[in-house]
Amino acid sequence: IDSLYKENNDMIKSLSICVNKFIGSYAFGIINELETDVLYALRKDSPLIIGVGENENFIASDVPSILKYTNKYIDIENDEIVKITKDEVTVYDKNCNIINKEISVFEGDANLVEKNGYETYMLKEIHEEAEVIKKTSEASIDFDITKYDEIDIVACGSAYHAGLVGKYMIEKLCNIKVNVCIASEYQYDKHFYRGKTLVIAISQSGETADTKKCVNIANDMGVDTLGIVNVKGSSIARICKHVIYTLAGPEIAVATTKAYLAQITTLILLAVKNSKEKINTEDLQKLPYYIETLINKDYTSLANMLYTKDDIYFIG
């Protein structure tokens, strides 16, 4: 970038050349020492949004990180170049043409990204699980999966394990063959897609790079795609032909808690709603109560016993 700028003295032109040459995934924030009141940004396959404030603008990877300052944001797509001052945001395509971008507004509760008296985000999010399951189980899920002969679930990490639960429930209740695949491996497999196939992509953030690549492969092959994601307007939500949002709210802690349970609940509901037999959902409605009962137990004595130990073996 520095070398190109010295040649043409034009940051947008220099970044345009870079965008057309760069290989791989990236999201860059760039400052030119000759114009320190301007911030430049560009991305490919890594998340990037622009927060739009009053006399201030921001670059960030996701919306929750800017909610302390503003609830307005702009989604940036692959190969777009952004020039930001405190008063203005200008977006260009890779050929230096200005693009008109829509400003979105986060409609959720900004307090959801605060600790609200809890010592850690993880503890707070554990205590939100019962309400999340209640909201998710009350949501209307009317996507028809019975028209498909086979379903591929692609995901990474905890979302993959949620997919394993989904496989069991869908096969048992809907009599549809389900394959659960780790996204980083699925993208390199040969796909035959015999019959009518649905690819379900599960991701809390909606930005998981490997999962996103799987969706693009399925889309390119003309296969239906369904995203089960937690973040509205995320990349996977935008590229999937269909989307179901889990209602977990922002999850800040690295270790997933409420989002994982919301994914499992969504998959169970998807199976129940498409079941060929009538399913009694009374037990599902009781889940929030059971979760809250478990969470509110006093685990102090157990913690006191464990925290002095050097090693713990989990056998199962």
Please give the residue ranges for each predicted region.
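Glycine-rich phosphate-binding loops that contact phosphosugars or nucleotide phosphates
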Residues: 146-289
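Cofactor-pocket helix-loop regions in the catalytic cores of large enzyme subunits
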Residues: 19, 137-155, 278, 283-316
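Short acidic (Asp/Glu) and glycine-rich catalytic loops that position anionic groups and cofactors
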Residues: 43, 114-115, 244-251, 268, ...
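Short beta-strand segments
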Residues: 29-31, 41-43, 60, 201-203, ...
